[in-house]
């Protein structure tokens, strides 16, 4: 599979079409071990992923329409915060077109470039907002999936 084609829905290694209570580095063990967990007791965080694995509207809803794109890693996806508090949601409040949050936890600069390439021709892209991931990260391409590599 060519993961770098234009007019192709971007690949995500996230859950697809579900709502889950934990995701990625936000998991129950880290919550239990957090000495400040009491500060989070009244904050509802869940992760609703669309059919393509992104924490945003269904992509098919916006085909051919004007949109802004937000790209990046877990900070863009909003891991550990309610979706309304993720930076793409805050920027979207000041914009006149829908913002598609295409951030993926563990993303690399490869991921950002690949997803942007995929979106060309799918949407009428107005602006692209990027919070660049660490430059040491990269993607490995397999026949039917992509792996994110984060060197230690």
Segments and roles (model prediction):
Residues 1-69, 122-126, 131-152:
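N-terminal secretory targeting modules
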Residues 50-110, 115-120:
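Serine-esterase "nucleophile elbow" of acetyl-processing enzymes
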């Amino acid at each position: 599979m060519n993961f770098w084609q234009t007019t192709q829905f971007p690949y995500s290694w996230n859950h697809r079409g579900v709502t889950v209570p934990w995701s990625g580095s936000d998991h129950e063990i880290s919550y239990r071990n957090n000495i400040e967990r009491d500060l989070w007791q009244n904050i509802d965080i869940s992760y609703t992923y669309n059919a393509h694995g992104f924490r945003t509207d269904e992509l098919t809803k916006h085909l051919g329409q004007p949109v802004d794109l937000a790209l990046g890693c877990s900070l863009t996806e909003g891991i550990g915060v309610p979706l309304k508090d993720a930076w793409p949601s805050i920027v979207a409040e000041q914009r006149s077109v829908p913002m598609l949050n295409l951030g993926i936890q563990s993303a690399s600069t490869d991921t950002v470039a690949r997803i942007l390439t995929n979106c060309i021709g799918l949407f009428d892209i107005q602006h692209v907002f990027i919070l660049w991931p660490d430059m040491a990260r990269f993607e490995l391409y397999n026949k039917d999936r992509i792996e994110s590599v984060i060197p230690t």
